[in-house]
Amino acid sequence: MTPPEKPVAVVTGASSGIGAATARLLAADGWRVVLVARRAERLQELAGEIEAAGGSVMAEALDAADGAAVERVADRVRSRWAPPSLVVNSAGAGVWRFLEETNPEQILEMIGAPYLAAANFCRAFMTDMLAAGGGAMIHVGSPASLMPWPGATAYTASRWALRGLHEALWMDLVGTGVTSSMVYFGEVSSEYFEANPDSQQYIPAIGGWIPTTTPERCAEVLLGVVRRPRRVVFHPFQLRLMWWLAKISPAPTRWLIARTGRRH
């Protein structure tokens, strides 16, 4: 008897951090994984690692903000394997600056990833998932889209766009068998802070009691959401507590964030 084909997952932002860790874990869990990011060399390294461990992988280097390029990737995935039953949107770019400190190119880049990248990949495979009557879209969100802090204007706006995409998709998909999930992580020990060494000091002091999470732990959380889809997930639990504090006492929470965050 021929064994069933392994399911297909697309992971954006797969060249490092949460995306790379998630791709490794999905491959080890029996998924055929499509790696998506802009850095071709890093993708090839990860693809080689996954193949050496016995996994099935495709590496697609592109700017996911380019809708036409995403469509071409989608066609290649369908041709080589099958439409994916999982899309993990972990691509994200950005600098934490006041708006007047941010140049137009940086603003466009931050809208490109995460928002346009997620919208393009969800759109590319939406019809396939609806026809199959199932599938999952998981988006990696930022606390900045829950409780904005000062000094990260364009970054925050781009994360709110991703949150809006998820919330709209969730409503669109009710009763279809296709799910949209938003997973919020606190600070993650990834390359972001190495590439943006001054950004850590801009996190409001009120967020200092939320522990740092590793990309590998984030990947485990995401795999848990694959197995049991939920609309919104917070990790670690202290982040959920802060979110509830913001909902119950919005004015005091905003005051604390403003007072302990970056100032002009």
Q: What do the predicted segments below correspond to?
A:
Residues 171-237:
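SDR active-site lid
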Residues 98-111:
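Substrate-binding pocket helix/loop in short-chain dehydrogenase/reductase
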Residues 15-16:
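Conserved glycine-rich cofactor-binding loop
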Residues 122, 158:
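Active-site helix of classical SDR
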Residues 31-45:
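Conserved glycine-rich Rossmann-like NAD(P)H-binding loop of the short-chain dehydrogenase/reductase
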Residues 61-72, 104:
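The beta1-alpha1 cofactor-binding region of Rossmann-like NAD(H)/NADP(H)-dependent oxidoreductases
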Residues 142:
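Residue(s) in the substrate-gating loop at a strand-loop-helix junction
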